[in-house]
Amino acid sequence: MSPLRRPLQRRLPLPGQRLVTLTALTPLLLLGACAGEDALNTDEPSDDSGGGQVVIGGQNYAEMQIMSEMYKALLAADGFDVKLTLVESRDVYTPEMQDGNVDVSADYLSSMTEFLNKQENGADAETVASPDPEATLEELKKLAEPTGIEPLEPAEAQNANAFAVTREFAEQNDLKTMSDLAELGEPVTLAAAEDCSQRSDCKLGLEEVYGLEISKVEPLGFGTTGTKDALKSGEVDLGQVGTSDATLETEDLVLLEDDKELQNAENLVPMVNSGFLAENPKVADTLNEMSSGLTTEDLADMIGKVDLKRELPEDVAREYLDGKGLI
C-alpha cells in the first residue's frame, strides 16, 4: 500500500449491498421455459394479454433486474404476455435470443459488441468497441445482423468499468483523475474481477495507458462488498467498480475520472430478436422511448433503492416508469 495513505477502520457492509447471482441456466432450461414449463426465476405470464407472448432474458443482479422489470412493465402495458428469465451470464441468454427462444434483453453496448465480435472472429479478435457510443453501436449492428438479433437505441445511462479510492485518500493526495493517481509514482494494489490481470480495460490498460505500477491484484470481484471492504480497510489502494454504483457515496468511496478514456462505452441498449421485431415493430418505439430519457443518475438512484433500501426491483421499475409517464 502507498505510504501516502492512512488506512480506514474496517466497517461491516451495508445490509442490501450484496449482488444477487444465480447458477447459469442451461439453454435447455431456457427453452423449456419458453415452451411453458416452469423454470428457475421465470415469471408467470402477465395478466394483460393481447399482443402475444414475449420472453425477456437477462442477467440476475440488481441493475439488470431493474432493467428487465422495466421492459416487462412496458411490454405488458402494450398487451403482451411477458415471461422473464434471469440467468448468470450473457453466454447463456444470447444464444437463446439468436435462436428465437428469448425475444428481448437489456445489455451493455461495448460488452455485447465484444461478445459477438469474439463469437464471430475468435477469442483473439481485435477489439472493435470504443469509448464512442455511436461508433460502437454501428459495430454492434454489423455483428448482430447475421446472428438474428438487433440493437435498438442505447440509453445515456451506462455502467462502465471504473476505479475508486477512499474519499480520505483522494482528499489527502488531491486525486480527481486516474492520471493524478499515476503521478503519485507509487505502486498500487488493486481489488478487481478475477480476470482483471488479463484485461486491457483493467490491469493491462492501467499499466499501459496510465503508467500505473500495479503491484498486486486481489481477485475480490467487480464492485463487490469484498472489494469495497478491502478499500476501506486499507488492504488495497484501488477498487474496480461500476459508474452507476449507488453505494459509493455511503461507503465514502469516490470514482477517479477516466481522463485518458481507457474504458469503452457501456450504455444500456435493448437487444431484440430480429424475427420478433419484424412481427412486432411497435416494441422498438416502446423501448426506445424509455431509453431516450434514462440517465446514469436515474439508474444509480434505482439501484440504491434495491441494494440499500431493499425495495423490490419490480416496484422500483414501475415507480420510475410511472413517474416518467411511460405506463
List each model region and its residues.
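Bacterial N-terminal signal peptides that target proteins for export
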Residues: P3-T23
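C-terminal motif of bacterial Sec signal peptides marking the signal peptidase cleavage site
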Residues: L29-A33
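Bacterial signal peptide processing site
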Residues: A35-D38
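Short, well-ordered beta-strand elements
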Residues: G50-E63, D81-T85, E186-A192
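Short helix-initiation/N-cap motifs at beta->coil->alpha
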Residues: A62, K83-P95, E194, S215-D229
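Short helices/loops that flank or line small-molecule/ion binding pockets
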Residues: E69-L74, D91-D103, L204-V209, G223-G239
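Acidic helix-start/capping segments at beta-turn-to-alpha-helix junctions
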Residues: L86-V102, L109-F115, N121
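Contiguous mixed-secondary-structure segments that line small-molecule binding/active-site clefts
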Residues: S110-L204, E208, S215-F222, D237, ...
